[in-house]
């Protein structure tokens, strides 16, 4: 535990690893050296961070199985992310949470569908009542001559001299 908090120890181990790798792989044409060094540094960091964390978690936690499972899943997910995979490992607890969320969303949507169906039924009933009221009334013949637009229209007998004043007359034009 003391070595985990000792920054100088951690930095000296990383420097030692880099120096060792440089001496092993002295070939300047080695293209994979940065990748190998990165992987080794990540593995070293995971080792140094996870073991003391798990020891503390196991001592302080009541349920050590869940802590171990969570730590292992987190480590594998980190390795998968570093490898470039988008998929992640999930535990049963996470799956149950997601299923609960999906079931909750489905219930909400079913309630909304039920409300919409009820509204549609009410609208159909309202339209039926309106249609029934319109069909019950009998429409008699309406005298279209007495409508607003037809009041000032005169018939041929009512015009003076019996001539239509709006009829076009012959017009001669001068050239």
Curated annotation (Swiss-Prot):
GO annotation, cellular component aspect: extracellular region; host caveola; host cell rough endoplasmic reticulum membrane; membrane
Residues binding Ca(2+): 120, 123
Membrane topology field: Single-pass type III membrane protein
Entry keyword annotation includes Transmembrane: yes
Keywords: Activation of host autophagy by virus, Calcium, Enterotoxin, Glycoprotein, Host endoplasmic reticulum, Host membrane, Host-virus interaction, Ion channel, Ion transport, Membrane, Metal-binding, Secreted, Signal-anchor, Toxin, Transmembrane, Transmembrane helix, Transport, Viral ion channel, Virulence
Residue stretches spanning the membrane: 29-51
Topological domain spans for side Cytoplasmic: 52-175
PTM: The N-glycosyl content is primarily Man(9)GlcNAc, with a small amount of Man(8)GlcNAc.
Main location: host cell
One Pfam family in the UniProt entry: Rota_NSP4
An example molecular function term from Gene Ontology annotations: metal ion binding
Glycosylation site list: 8, 18
Subunit structure: Homotetramer. Interacts with the immature particle in the viroplasm. Interacts with host CAV1, early and late in infection. Interacts with host integrin ITGA1/ITGB1 heterodimer. Interacts with host integrin ITGA2/ITGB1 heterodimer. Interaction with microtubules blocks trafficking to the Golgi apparatus.
Family: Belongs to the rotavirus NSP4 family.
HAMAP family: ROTA_NSP4
Function: Plays an essential role in the virus replication cycle by acting as a viroporin. Creates a pore in the host endoplasmic reticulum and as a consequence releases Ca(2+) in the cytoplasm of infected cell. In turn, high levels of cytoplasmic calcium trigger membrane trafficking and transport of viral ER-associated proteins to viroplasms, sites of viral genome replication and immature particle assembly.
UniProt remark on domains: Binds 1 calcium ion per tetramer.
Name the record gives this protein: Non-structural glycoprotein 4
Species of provenance: Rotavirus A (strain RVA/Human/Australia/RV-5/1981/G2P1B[4]) (RV-A)
């Amino acid at each position: 535990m003391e070595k985990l908090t000792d920054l100088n120890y951690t930095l000296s181990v990383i420097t030692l690893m880099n120096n060792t790798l440089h001496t092993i792989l002295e070939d300047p044409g080695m293209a994979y050296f940065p990748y190998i060094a990165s992987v080794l540094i990540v593995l070293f960091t995971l080792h140094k961070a996870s073991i003391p964390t798990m020891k503390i978690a196991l001592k302080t936690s009541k349920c050590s199985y869940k802590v171990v499972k969570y730590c292992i899943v987190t480590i594998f997910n980190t390795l998968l992310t570093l490898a470039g995979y988008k998929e992640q490992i999930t535990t049963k607890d996470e799956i149950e949470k997601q299923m609960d969320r999906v079931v909750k969303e489905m219930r909400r949507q079913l309630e909304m569908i039920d409300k919409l169906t009820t509204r549609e039924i009410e609208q159909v009933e309202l339209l039926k009542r309106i249609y029934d009221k319109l069909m019950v009334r009998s429409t008699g013949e309406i005298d279209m001559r007495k409508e607003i637009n037809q009041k000032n229209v005169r018939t041929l007998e009512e015009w003076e001299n019996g001539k239509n004043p709006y009829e076009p007359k012959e017009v001669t034009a001068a050239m």
